[in-house]
Amino acid sequence: MSTDQPAVGSIFDLYKIGAGPSSSHSIGTERAARRFLARQPTPPASVRVTLFGSLAATGRGHLTDQGIRRALDGIPVEIVWDTDAGNLKHPNTIRFDALGVGGRATNSWTVYSIGGGNLRDDSGPVGDDEPARYSHRTVTELLALCEAQGLSFWQLVEKTERAPWPRLETIWEAMEASVRRGLDSRENFLPGPLKLARKARTTLLRGRDLASPQRDLALLAAFALAVSEENAAGGTIVTAPSCGAAGVLPGMLYYYHTVKGLPRRDILEALATAGLFGSVIRANASISGAEVGCQGEVGSACSMAAAAGAQLLGGTLRQIEYAAEIGMEHHLGLTCDPIEGYVQIPCIERNMTACLRAAECAVFALLTDGRHLVSFDDVIDVMYRTGADLQSAYRETARGGLAELWRRRMSGQSKAGAATAAPAEHHSYCD
């Protein structure tokens, strides 16, 4: 397990409002560029930014360079995409070099975008992360503490965090807005070369006239798709725990609030509980697809949403823990292989299916007494170890899996087109 943090940090280090499409490749790198500029005694003549590992492999599709240029505020920037460097301390490594008038480096800084928009350098955490707030590191310990003190998970958050409710209200408002924008969008396609069709609005329009349970499934799907499509379009979302998995938890909560009519306070309490589980994952493993694959992003999001759903259904502490465990256990080994490096295929549909699965996990957990053989903490440990075993091709480098299949397909079409001298035809596949 990761041992960088002594205990579980604030849930507000997990929930960040920002622009998609990637928390590590977009939000994190832009934050790093701003931080680097603030460190300079005088503005440099220019800046050279070298992106390594996953950032170099998929950064163009994640709009990494655009965010860096925006953060450096008009200073000339050279972006170097180094996909060959090995022995990196983290797959999302960035080096900033401040350059003088003659092009000589006057100041350098290496920083790591570790997921969820969070940063770390060789000295430790970077930025405005709050101090660790929870006295324990595992859900097992936190659950025992809650039982001993007669607290729910959300009450533990209330007791531990600094003024949580106004901050959670702000987070929820941003989540709600991202769902509504995604549903209201009249754009037919997402940006990028895939020309992927938006499906949230049509899913909503077609699904709301169905009979239950199909209607409920369709609405959950539409809400999750809405946020994921907004994220892919570079819209404002909340990391939960990342941009690439930002549709799962809001989709679940929006459904219970708008369809089932649960009051806003219940939603905020569920958001607090989900944040606690996500923070445990962040402290003990990783929420970065570049480090552990998509199990750390969508798997974590499903786990968080399952915990939230179980709480909204009236689950006990142990039933909530069980729901979260199921949500992660059945995403173990999930790869991160985005086609062309864009947070679109398989990411958007994956958010949708994880939202549906989270709802199922919550319902099933409440049909039990909450006792089970593999704990939430056990499965988080296995997730982290599994991620370490994944080849780099399956950790956000767009070199394996679906990304490789697509690349071979496009290469074959290019060769066929060159042989016949016919103009290239853009295909729209099932996604």
Task: Please name every model-derived segment.
Residues 26-39, 250-261, 306-314:
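Alpha-helical support elements that line or immediately flank enzyme active sites
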